[in-house]
Regions:
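Mid-domain catalytic core of redox enzymes
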Residues: 63-172, 176, 209
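Active-site/ligand-binding neighborhood in enzyme catalytic cores
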Residues: 1-69
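Residue-level signal for well-ordered alpha-helical scaffold segments within enzymatic catalytic domains
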Residues: 3, 49, 53-56, 107, ...
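Short, internal active-site loops enriched in acidic
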Residues: 8-12, 68, 73-75, 222-230
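Short loop/turn motifs at secondary-structure junctions
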Residues: 57, 92, 213-216
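Aromatic-acidic/polar surface patches that form glycan- and anion
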Residues: 39-47, 89-91, 117-119, 191-199, ...
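Conserved flavin/dinucleotide-binding core of flavoenzymes
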Residues: 135-284
Length: 284
């Protein structure tokens, strides 16, 4: 359970809402009518496939631009943005939907209307390119591999489904969520560590199943997610802060798993459906 709380909520048992843990694990007993319980639904593009499907229904889509401000004047929202060439522009709309975590959204909005600070868990993701995945004692490597007794979250093997009969180059992705101290303090500490230190940290964490892993590493890429996922801290799920986040504030609307307090795809999907209904009702 400790591992699952770090993996799904970004915190230790004492840092996570008991209700969130019970709700999440109680909801994982469903079984498909046409598949085994351990069947995984994936696409070669990953979640990019879902983005492509969602984009198909949009008639006027402008990409490669970044919004940096949202202002509402006399009831009319305007989005300030900048394109890939550095040119600034504005979009005037009847309504604006921000599908963003609140720590980002609050930087686009009037500070007086922004959400209060929420608790976000820092994550570190390390991609190790290997000339081959070295053998390990015990069971054969799976797609998602957890190291017993480790504080990290294990690794994912990119070529797990390969049908190759001989060892081949691969990429394994090592995940670690930092917890046990205030997130702000952990973010400060993250920035003091060098690339070499992060690489060694990941390799050392996988030394138990792969003692000679370091000999097979040809490249290492590290990414620090300072606000990797919202953490459902004790009291947050049924507290006034999250309750206030549910209220629509036309003409600016929000849709994100932050509003549920759990960084899960199912929660994000639900928030998208709900805000679509709110938008339709408000726009008439």
């Amino acid at each position: 359970v400790e591992y699952a709380c770090r993996d799904d909520f970004g915190g230790n048992l004492d840092e996570v809402s008991a209700w969130a843990g019970l709700h999440y694990f109680a909801s994982r007993t469903g079984e498909a009518a046409n598949a085994e319980r351990d069947t995984v639904l994936t696409w070669p593009q990953g979640n990019g496939k879902l983005v492509e499907l969602l984009a198909e229904g949009l008639a006027d889509l402008r990409v490669n631009a970044m919004a940096f401000g949202v202002e509402v004047t006399n009831g009319t929202p305007r989005v300030k943005a900048i394109d890939a060439h550095g040119e600034a522009f504005e979009i005037e709309a009847r309504a604006v939907l921000l599908c963003l975590p609140r720590f980002v959204a609050r930087r686009l909005l009037d500070p007086a209307k922004a959400s209060p600070d929420l608790v976000y868990s820092p994550w570190v993701v390390t991609n190790l390119t290997l000339d081959e995945l070295p053998p390990s004692p015990g069971v054969l490597p799976a797609w998602d591999n957890v190291v017993f007794g480790s504080d990290t979250l294990g690794y994912v093997n990119a070529t797990h489904q390969s049908l190759a009969s001989v060892p081949q180059a691969t990429v394994i992705t090592h995940y670690e969520t930092l917890c046990g101290q205030p997130p702000a303090k952990l973010r400060e500490w993250m920035l003091t560590q060098t690339h070499a230190q992060w690489c060694s940290r990941a390799i050392d964490a996988l030394a138990a199943p792969h003692p000679n892993l370091r000999e097979h590493v040809t490249q290492a890429d590290v990414w620090l997610w300072g606000h990797g996922m919202i953490r459902p801290t004790p009291g947050f799920i049924w507290g006034k802060t999250r309750e206030a986040m549910q209220s629509a504030t036309p003409p600016v609307f929000h849709a994100h798993s932050d509003m549920s307090g759990m960084a899960l795809f199912e929660e994000a999907f639900t928030r998208g459906e709900r805000v679509a209904a709110e938008l339709r009702a408000w726009l008439g």
